[in-house]
């Protein structure tokens, strides 16, 4: 997850060959098979019709409230993103193999919900877009960073990040409680949020959305909170 004090997006230089792995603020490193995660990735993040890839949609979590980890404040809210140069930053620190696979699957102009997590009122607060596809995450090499990985080498990096840019605030805050209410109802009726990853893989801080899920959540902006 990005932090205001970090270098500007793209500062790590040109993209290198495909890497492997990354973390999000709320995730810990997991011992997992990359092969298994790649299989999961194919099933959950690439939507195809007649052999053509459709747009991908995402939900990306970040912590809006201060929390120190190894002396560094992990806070990064949507307001912090708005305050960045060109309202753009690198989404670094992902250290979970499945989340890393999701980051690698992201394409330019993919849309993502900015989700405030690990706070008093978790939920969706805004929209952003992917403006640079996966490239090496510089924090894996920085010894003083909470996400330093001594097993990762600059000539063979393990973890990746993407660059994101603020698009807009949501017209209203969409809370976790509201989403959960719809999820539970849709499990019974077959509605759009019946299988939403936010509730089936809660700890993942980078999550895929189907277009149906994305469109339904956008439609909630115009509705009264449930």
UniProtKB/Swiss-Prot annotation:
Signal sequence bounds: none
The keyword Transcription appears for this protein: no
Residue ranges, compositional bias (Polar residues): 29-38
InterPro entries per the UniProt record, alphabetical: 5hmC_binding (IPR052181), EVE_domain (IPR002740), PUA-like_sf (IPR015947), THYN1-like_EVE (IPR047197)
The keyword Phosphoprotein is annotated on this UniProt entry: yes
Disulfide bonds: none
Annotated spans, Disordered: 1-38
Domain of life: Eukaryota
Gene3D superfamilies for this protein: ph1033 like domains
Major subcellular site: nucleus
CDD domains (alphabetical): EVE
UniProt subcellular location: Nucleus
Cellular component per GO, a single term: nucleus
Post-translational modifications: Phosphorylated.
Motif (Nuclear localization signal): 5-10
Keyword vocabulary terms for this entry: Nucleus, Phosphoprotein
Chain intervals with Basic and acidic residues compositional bias: 14-28
UniProt function note: Specifically binds 5-hydroxymethylcytosine (5hmC), suggesting that it acts as a specific reader of 5hmC.
PANTHER family cross-referenced by the UniProt entry: THYMOCYTE NUCLEAR PROTEIN 1
Name of the protein described by the UniProt record: Thymocyte nuclear protein 1
